Amino acid sequence: DDIFRILDSRNYTFGDMFRRCERRYGLDNFHFTRLDIAIDDKNEKPFFTIEQIKKKCEKEEFISNSEGYKFDESKFDDFDTAKTVYIGAGKSGLSYRFYDKDKEVCSKYNKSLDEVGSWKRTEMQLRDEKAHAFAMTFKDRPLELGELAFGLLANNLRFVVPNRNESNKSRWKTCRFWERFLGAVEV
């Protein structure tokens, strides 16, 4: 949160910050070791639920450069839980988190779901070379963050529909909710 306040107070974008780092330290004298990118779905009817992502993972109906997945569920209220799905190891070059941001905000700020509204978050965590490469691309194309983020997601993670007649999972069709989500980028 502090970084947003600092940038806003100076009327800087992240692209400005990256360019300033490059000018100050030289192109090869600084390195981004971690970069988190969040995509928020605040549609009343979200593109997908965390439960849908969980089921796709349980059935191994996804293709990813990141290995493994796990789930976390915590009590939200007397009737519901907040869910998180992790794909990939946290220390790997690229990992993903899908979670109920609406329930997190409700718990943190003592608000109701009606006040907050539907809010599902997709996060990509990039480390080391992947983080630095993305930051440098973003520096050169700061107005295209949505396109860059969705492109990274589309090229590295895909939820699929099983096909009994095809043993090669890479030939399976992309599931509808994922196609719709990836097509939702605001340019």
Give names to the regions the model predicted:
Residues 1-186:
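Structured, helix-rich domain cores that form ligand/interaction pockets
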